[in-house]
């Protein structure tokens, strides 16, 4: 649901009948007004018993969305980035990016991969320091601080953006090196890539069908699920430029919400829904 000045709501229903769970999430981005103390992204999740419609929980949708979105992006980065990557450009250094890059580096180290990784960070209100602090104990993570998007993206093997509001492309085509992977978590700022990248991967075709250049890149688009199931190839060489619109779908929210709810060791709040057929 689009609003003025780039604000919006996303309404995301989902049902998993085998688990007897249904969910509706509403999450939106709204510019912060003067004097407000909140995140620009806020959301809530309603969790239901799917066979009765009884509400089981009202949950913080922002926290769950941040976790699953960042982890989905990190998974995409591991899946589609060229194996010999060295340099990662990061734009939008907020909560989602924090989850994403922590998960990305942690997954490398968990597999015994101690390679040197250079993170190129855009300078913005000191946010770069938060990312640098995450890896102060890892001597193989290095940093380059950049003042322009051209510096961040140019020469990077992997580019991840988590900016939630942008009105134009970050850079022109020549800054995307051969073999790079681009993951625009919030889908913004890389519309020019739709026109010349070699491969596009997505978690849900319907989510991107309304994109301006969908008809142009649809023939080279593959569902990530098909790659994971072995039904389609992922990256096939080190020269393909790959664009990934894989940032999580409602079923991921449901899985996170159901698992958190199942582990909640707190008393239930009474829910006084009507138990009478006639209540008027």
Where are these regions (language model features)?
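N-terminal ligand-binding/catalytic initiation module
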Residues: 1-66, 74, 84, 222, ...
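Glycine-rich adenosine-cofactor-binding loop
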Residues: 73, 84-107, 122-127
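Short helix-loop-beta connector
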Residues: 80-87, 177-178
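NAD(P)-binding Rossmann-fold cofactor-contacting core
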Residues: 107-135
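Rossmann-like adenosine-cofactor binding region
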Residues: 141-215
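Adenosine-phosphate binding glycine-rich loop
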Residues: 193-280
């Amino acid at each position: 649901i689009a609003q003025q000045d780039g604000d919006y709501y996303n309404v995301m229903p989902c049902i998993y009948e085998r688990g007897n769970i249904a969910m509706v999430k509403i999450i939106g981005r709204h510019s912060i007004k003067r004097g407000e103390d909140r995140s620009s992204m806020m959301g809530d999740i309603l969790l239901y018993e799917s066979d009765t419609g009884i509400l089981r929980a009202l949950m913080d949708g922002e926290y769950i969305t941040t976790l699953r979105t960042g982890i989905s992006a990190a998974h995409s980065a591991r899946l589609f980035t060229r194996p010999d990557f060295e340099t990662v450009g990061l734009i939008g250094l907020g909560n989602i990016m924090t989850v994403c890059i922590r998960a990305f580096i942690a997954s490398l180290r968990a597999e015994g991969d101690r390679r040197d990784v250079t993170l190129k960070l855009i300078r913005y209100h000191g946010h770069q320091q938060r990312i640098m602090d995450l890896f102060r104990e890892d001597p193989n993570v290095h940093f380059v601080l950049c003042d322009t998007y051209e510096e961040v993206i140019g020469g990077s093997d992997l580019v991840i953006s988590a900016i939630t509001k942008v009105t134009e492309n970050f850079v022109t085509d020549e800054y995307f090196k051969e073999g790079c992977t681009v993951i625009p978590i919030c889908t913004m700022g890389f519309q020019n890539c739709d026109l010349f990248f070699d491969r596009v991967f997505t978690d849900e075709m319907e989510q991107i069908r309304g994109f301006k250049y969908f008809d142009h890149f649809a023939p080279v688009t593959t569902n990530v699920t098909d790659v994971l199931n072995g039904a389609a190839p992922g990256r096939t060489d080190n020269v393909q430029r790959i664009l990934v619109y894989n940032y999580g779908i409602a079923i991921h929210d449901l899985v996170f919400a159901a698992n958190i709810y199942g582990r909640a060791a707190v008393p239930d709040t009474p829910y006084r829904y009507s138990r009478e057929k006639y209540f008027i």
